[in-house]
């Protein structure tokens, strides 16, 4: 089971943090919150819908960091947890990524700005 203050969805635990951090600081924070924790990886429209329902009522904010980043600055985007990037929802927009909490769109943002974020980890066994 997920910790009491995290939400469960399809084998993962999620928590919205009403803190503003840079992408790096948010990712580090997520790794400290739960074993195997990272910024959220959105792999399907169902997972995006779940994140929107979870995040928007808490944050009333438009954008959250997600775990997608251009790690090698070569325009090759990859999920922080190394999952395959099969599902995509890009708008046309620098090296880190945010998702809108009001609809299904992703944007690139400079990694050093502060945003709210959602952490994700596997359900502990």
From Swiss-Prot:
Miscellaneous: Shows greater sequence similarity to the beta than alpha subunits compared to other heterodimer snaclecs.
Q: What is this protein called?
A: Snaclec B6
Location comes to: Secreted
Spell out the subunit comment.
Heterodimer; disulfide-linked.
Q: Does the keyword Glycoprotein apply?
A: yes
The primary site where this protein sits is: secreted
Q: Where is the signal peptide?
A: none
Family from the record: Belongs to the snaclec family.
The protein's GO terms of the molecular function aspect are: toxin activity
